[in-house]
Amino acid sequence: MTTLATFIFLVTLLFVLWQPKGLDIGFTALAGAFIAVITGVVSFSDVFEVTGIVWNATLTFVSVILISLILDKVGLFEWSAIHMLHASKGSGLKMFVYIILLGAVVAAFFANDGAALILTPIVLAMVKNIGFSKRAIFPFIIASGFIADTTSLPLIVSNLVNIISADYFNISFSQYLSRMIIPNLFSLLASLLVLWLYFRKAIPKSFDANHIKKPIDAINDLKLFKISWIVLVILLFGYLISEFTKIPVSIFTGIIAFIFLILARKSNAVNIKQVIKGAPWNIVLFSIGMYIVVFGLRNAGITLILAKILEYISNYGLFSTILGMGFISAFLSSIMNNMPTVLIDAIAIGQSNVHGMLKEGLIYANVIGSDLGPKITPIGSLATLLWLHVLTQKDVKISWGTYFKTGIIITIPVLFFTLLGLYLTLILF
């Protein structure tokens, strides 16, 4: 059973990351799940349990991405980015900092995938239009992709990993926010510092800001642009209301996304079919399929091994527990993707004989490691692979070697300081 479960998991993961001839990740994961069921590695009751765990998370994620795609077509993100350029007043360093801050805000409210895949092309087009060299463009591109993950901690909806973990351990919106807002600030500050230290020689000291277009010129539909702000306020209230009413957050985000699609239907700036097609529907199938395969590892007793390791680490106190869990999940995410990692770790945490504040430390450190760890390697998250593909299409090629060298140097210190922020949160508040 152990060998078979491990084999099914590794083969499924290989095909998900490799995607031969464009094989869809949803189909691959479901195929792996089907094999796991017919071989007896998982039962039908496991299938229902997995569906119960992931349905809210994945539908929330898809809804948020749908909303962000409409906002992108309207021009909200480009409008925001142009404001950042004007605020920089010709300073390359200020522009670098403001773009990172914008990325952090977008990641918090529209998920890491939305920030990386929507904001990066906008930033790329802007720095090219300004006339930056390839050497000068690289820091802005890496920063846009990096900050999307490192600051996707504060809200449950900021990352699919967050939603999965919060649903698994029944963590409320406000409870999650109270624990992750300080770590996210630590991550933002550490990211700013580390990115600046790493790229300080490549960032231009100044640029000509006279030819940057006005923010108003980025808006493709002024009426829908104004409505967008109302939608954002309602979305935020939806997050809060879902907590007090105990109604799944996906119901609120789904209704808001549907209404927004109806409102955008008459806009010339938004192609509804294109927006709906652009949503990550395959993530729903991928989540269910991949997590069924992961449950096979649980049934085979593999997650119990990790549970024992976590129990051992917890004997050395809260700080060691947080650091250990954070770096374990980061390492696993970097080599086998953060989506299966977060659930494997969550299952192990649930199986471990760790309680109280130590268990809380494990839960949140797992989220932090699974959010930040993927930046170490290109295969750490599906978003990174897609991000690299988008850049290649725009004639910006970043080799896996270059990405790994940059990613590991930048990620490790940021991960440490973010985990330190979690430790301080738990002991002080």
From Swiss-Prot:
Similarity comment: family membership: Belongs to the ArsB family.
Topology of the protein relative to the lipid bilayer: Multi-pass membrane protein
GO-annotated biological processes: response to arsenic-containing substance
Protein name: Arsenical pump membrane protein
Main location: membrane
Biological role: Involved in arsenical resistance. Thought to form the channel of an arsenite pump.
Coiled-coil annotated residue ranges, if any: none
Taxon lineage: Bacteria, Bacillati, Bacillota, Bacilli, Bacillales
Gene name of the record: arsB
